[in-house]
Structures are given as structure tokens and as C-alpha cells.
Amino acid sequence: MCDKIFHNLSGKTLVATPYVITKGIYHKSLIYMLSHTEEGAIGLIFNRLVNHVDLKSFFKIKEDKITSQVIVPIYLGGPIEHEKGFFLHSRDYNKNLLLDFHNDLAVSSNLEISEDIAFGQGPKNSLFIVGYTAWKPGQLEEELEKNLWLVMDCNKEFIFADNPENKWHNALKHLGIDEMYFSSQIGNA
């Protein structure tokens, strides 16, 4: 039996195929991969808009600093640790980064970025995401073998595009795939 070759998907986007038949969180989801190693993987779903929040009240920014509300959408990044918030943002903002990628994206998770966004000094593009998605060692590779995910290069214009409900269909279109081409049978040909 041959050893499987490991391909690092950090900085890539996972596109759920229709084979992710559950109507839950992963159905038609898009996941930006933060880290993918032989020890497992972590990602953020970026097309599950769940609500809007006032940054001032959510992050308890001092009232005297900001006079008006700054409402931002909240995305559900996955089923793990919903009390953790992340900003997936353009690389033009580089203060206290949690993760820095070579594809013009970064991740921050601190009060400073929320204050900078509230003052109009934050990144040009950002998504506020609560929670994350994680896989155990080998789990993501197994799901890829079962055709549950497609992999595409990251495109920040795509990630930050309006209308999150259309992003999954647009991802398939970007990959040249019509949803109708997927068989109702799960498996490999």
C-alpha cells in the first residue's frame, strides 16, 4: 500500500459539494482554511450570515470614543467555540495579526481591530466570524476522498463579495461546475 501524499490546503477555500447532504452548517458552505497540517485542520466558514452586531456594544468599546453605532454582519465560522470572534480581513491592515497569509488575507482576533474598524481605520475589507471548524488528523483528507469538498484558490474579492447566500453558487460557477452535474449517488466513479 502506498503512503498518501499530504497536500497543505492552508490559505485555500473549500467548497462543499452537494454530497454534504446534511442540511446543517456545512450544507453549501465555503470554508477559508486557516491551517492544515498532518495534525489536523482549522477553517472559517465565510458564507453563513447569522446576524448583525453593533461593534461598540459587542466589544464594549468606550462610549466616549464612538458616538454612533457601527453595525457589522456576523458570520458563523463553524460549530466550535462560538464565543471566539475572528476578523478575516484584507492584508492592508497589519496590526497584531493572529495569522498572516501570502494571498493578501490575514486574521485578527483582538479589541484593537474592532476599535479601528469602528473609527474607519481598519482594513478595507473584513468579515466578523464567530466560531470555527476543525478536523482531526486525516479527517479532512478522508472527506476529500469522499468528494465532500472541492478545493479552490483563495480570491479575496470573492470572499468579501456581497450577498453571502450567492457565494456557494458563484464558487461552483467559478470552478466551471453546474450543480446539476452532481449525481445523486455518493461515491467515486
Curated annotation (Swiss-Prot):
Classification via SUPFAM superfamilies = VC0467-like
Q: Which GO terms describe its cellular component?
A: cytosol
Q: Which family does it belong to?
A: Belongs to the UPF0301 (AlgH) family.
Which NCBIfam families does the UniProt entry name for this protein? Answer: PRK00228.1-4 (NF001268)
Recorded protein name is UPF0301 protein RT0098
Q: Origin organism of this chain?
A: Rickettsia typhi (strain ATCC VR-144 / Wilmington)
